A protein has these predicted regions:
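Amphipathic alpha-helical transducer elements in NTP-driven molecular machines
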Residues: 66, 110-114, 127, 131, ...
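Loop/turn-to-beta-strand initiation segments
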Residues: 3-10, 77-78, 124-127
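Non-catalytic, charged low-complexity extensions flanking SF2 helicase motor domains
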Residues: 198-210
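Conserved helicase motor
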Residues: 84-87, 103-117, 129-137
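Post-DEXD/H (motif II) to motif III coupling segment of the RecA-like Helicase ATP-binding lobe
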Residues: 1-48
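Conserved interdomain linker/interface between the two RecA-like ATPase lobes of SF2 helicase motors
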Residues: 28-89, 93, 100-103, 207
C-alpha cells in the first residue's frame, strides 16, 4: 500500500461536520448538484395524516394516505411506502391488500428480499411497504414515494433526503411525487426539503438543469 494516496469520499448526505469543514476550507470537495438526465430533484410535499398509530390500532390506513396510494395504484405507477419500523410492514401490507392483492412488504431480514425487489422492478408488485433499507440502489421508472410517520426519529434529514432521492431517477421518466405523511412537522423534515431545494437551485445556477 502506498504511503501517500488520495482518499475520496462520495456521499449524497454529508453530516454537519463535513458541511462545516467544507465551508471553512478545512476539507476540499466539490458539490455535484444535478442528475445525469438534467431534471430537478423531486421536492417533497408535507401532508398531515393525523394520529396514524391510532388509525393502525383500529385496523385503518389514514384516509389522506389511502387516497394518495389508491390514486397511483389506479394509474399503475409503482410506489414505495416507507414506514419507521419493521413491525408496521406486515400490518400495513395486509390492510392495503384491498387496493391490490399483489401489494407486499420487504425488510432487511426478509429471505425473499431480492426476489421481491426484482418483482417490484418488473411491475409484478405494484406497491412495496418497506423501511429505510431500500433508500439506495433501486431505480424504477415512474416511481412514487411516500413516508408514513415522517416525524419519527429514525427519519433524520439524511434519511429523508435519501428516500426522496428514490423518485425521479429514471432517464425515461425523470419525475415522481414524494410525500412525507406526518403527525407533526419536524426540523428534520424541514431541513430535508430545504436541502433538496438548495441542490436544485445550485444545479440551475450551474446550468445542470434544462
Amino acid at each position: 500500500m502506498k504511503e501517500k494516496a488520495a482518499r475520496i469520499y462520495l456521499t449524497a448526505t454529508p453530516d454537519e461536520k463535513w458541511k462545516r469543514n467544507f465551508r471553512t476550507g478545512k476539507q476540499k470537495g466539490i458539490i455535484v448538484s444535478g442528475r445525469y438526465h438534467r431534471h430537478p430533484l423531486p421536492v417533497p410535499l408535507f401532508s398531515w395524516c393525523g394520529n396514524w398509530k391510532k388509525s393502525l390500532h383500529h385496523k385503518k390506513i389514514p384516509r389522506v394516505l389511502l387516497q394518495w396510494l389508491k390514486m397511483y395504484v389506479n394509474k399503475k405507477y409503482p410506489i414505495f411506502l416507507f414506514v419507521p419500523h419493521v413491525r408496521y410492514i406486515e400490518e400495513i401490507g395486509l390492510l392495503l391488500k384491498g387496493l391490490d392483492h399483489r401489494i407486499d412488504g420487504v425488510h432487511a431480514e426478509d429471505p425473499m428480499r431480492k426476489e421481491k425487489v426484482e418483482a417490484f422492478r418488473k411491475g409484478d408488485i405494484p406497491l412495496l411497504v418497506t423501511t429505510t433499507i431500500l433508500e439506495r440502489g433501486v431505480i424504477v421508472k415512474n416511481l412514487q414515494v411516500a413516508v408514513l410517520g415522517a416525524e419519527e426519529e429514525i427519519f433524520s434529514e439524511s434519511a429523508l433526503v435519501q428516500i426522496a432521492g428514490r423518485a425521479g431517477r429514471s432517464f425515461e421518466e425523470p419525475y415522481g411525487e414524494v410525500v412525507y405523511f406526518h403527525y407533526g412537522k419536524t426540523e428534520s423534515m424541514v431541513r430535508a426539503k430545504r436541502h433538496i431545494q438548495s441542490m436544485n437551485k445550485s444545479a440551475k445556477e450551474q446550468g445542470l438543469i434544462d
